[in-house]
């Protein structure tokens, strides 16, 4: 956590910013909640990173994206913007494998009309594949499943209409296709 990070500064840089945060929390009787605050805001940051990256990958004719930073900026003015601390160590907010699920050379994406569905509604989605990897994939290589957190499968299928080509994002259901 931020308070524990103070001990990592062993050189000439004095973490006055973190000490001020620690002192402020201590004066307010909230120092024991510092880890909770860090985790809550950090988990939100991870969700927002995912949303931003997926939106970029779904954008037709976009060739990439740039993030402000993945680690906190410790310089002139504190910017605790990263999923990693200023020493590039994990803050425990997201596992590397989970991050690679939405930030990798090949990323499966789902498009749907809204984020909240009622139990009596039919969920409809279109599968997209963002492929900036070295290989081209055929429709016979795509299998998908809609599952819950416990692994219960609600629907599954194959990509008989899908064509995933190199350096393109293509819609599995064929509504739009981006080609060179």
What are these regions (language model features)?
Residues 167-179:
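Aromatic sugar-binding surface patches on proteins
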Residues 1-158, 166:
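Substrate-binding clefts and catalytic carboxylate motifs of secreted carbohydrate-active enzymes
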